[in-house]
Amino acid sequence: MTKSKGIQSIKVSGRILRALTETERGMPLSQLARQTGMPPGQCHSYVTSLKKSRLVSQDVDTGAYTLGPFALELGVAWLKHDSLANETVNLAKRLANDTGFMSLVSIWTHKGPTIVHVSEAVQPMALNIRQGTTFSSINSATGAVFAAFGSEVIKQFVTRELRDHLQFRQPDRLRYEKSFWDYVEVVKNDGMAATEGRPIPGVNAISIPIMGTQGTLSFACTLVGSVTELKVGPREKHRLLMAQVNEEIDSWGTVA
């Protein structure tokens, strides 16, 4: 009986964690209880335990619940056992070693593009970029890759973030929105995204997609460097290098 109860507790906790993976801005207890089909009191007991294990966090201002830092740590641990993830991390390490620039691997989470691996630059830059950092989906090279190659759910997220960003730009909102999606089409055609001096002034980035076996976007691999050293023009050497890497990734074939 005790064993059965224990397993049931894991299942219920799993429902809570699943619900939190599907929210963008966190959930208040009442919504989380409805989403998981539990009375609020029972749901509160579970999230209290999950908070103690750092699987769940609670915003001190809003009271909303989100996935906690240990959830990310579990995800990173899983990545070590995934062959495509290993290939991607090894690629990032090689790019950092060959170019001297910082190289990042990001995945899509409920918060947007999120870094899961950082290969530091040969001469580290004073940037607040680390594992768990989330990029803007509309103002970064990594975000543009997810907007261009991601699923319909990702595109809906990007659309909401874009419209939130543009809500005070009437009457030019539609023009800005069209300009953004035109840029996304360019990214799709080029097979990569590049940004100059944004979102971080003085920093450039080039990002490429890593597609999984089903043809869906799994990761983005991003090279980050200063505007004076990492040139991102169409014929610049590091952009051409990333184009070569794109061809190499195609040759990976069906990585299990």
Regions found by a protein language model. Give the residues of each.
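Short hydrophobic alpha-helical segments used for membrane anchoring or interfacial signaling
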Residues: 105-110, 118-119
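Amphipathic alpha-helical regulatory segments at dimerization interfaces
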Residues: 19, 46, 87-98, 186, ...
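Extended hydrophobic
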Residues: 172-247
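Short, solvent-exposed recognition segments
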Residues: 125-199
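Short glycine-/small-residue motifs
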Residues: 55, 115, 219-220
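N-terminal helix-turn-helix
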Residues: 1-81, 247, 251-255
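Short, acidic, Ser/Thr-enriched surface-loop or helix-capping motifs
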Residues: 60, 108, 211-213
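Conserved segment of winged-helix/HTH DNA-binding domains
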Residues: 70-98, 127
